[in-house]
Amino acid sequence: GWQGRRGGRYNAIQTNDKFPDMKELSEQVHAMGLKLGIYSSPWIGTYAAHIGSYSDNPDGENQWIKDGNHNENFRYEKPGGNYWQDRKEMYRHGAYSFVEADARQWADWQIDYLKYDWNPNDLYHVKEMHDALRATDRDIVYSISNSAPYADAPLWVEYTDCWRTTGDIRDTWKSISSIGFEQQRWAPFCGPG
């Protein structure tokens, strides 16, 4: 993951040492004629155990970061802890939102695409990020994941640019065929990008 601690001009998620200068990276990628995407979550932690756009602390620093329960790249790591159970505690929305701060930071870095990942997707958090991205001066493609509920398809069209309709793909025929051949009901909600 790219995520480090909160800070900078907006108190947004900053990069860890693996990505020392996201703006420079963006400029290099754009110079090659490509676009640059980023991954985040409206939870306090992502599926990969890095910080997300919410926190239980008003300063945005999650307790596990304050307690030092992370590796050198600020990924959750607690010696002697139950890694999988502890990580599940991150899969929730915290008391404080830093969505606007994160969106402003990504716009400053010239990010082109956001994959916003949590499950189940809900209108409040979808719209919150939509509004934050639209308030920046950058056109950022907004993709939600995963398993966007079909019943809310009209909302996804209104507030996102793209959405994922299934869980992870596996290297089995059942997985490939169910993902590839059982998505017809989504067709009425497709359109040009």
Describe each region flagged by the PLM.
Residues 36, 106, 129, 142-144, ...:
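Generic structural hydrophobic/aromatic packing signal, biased to beta-strands
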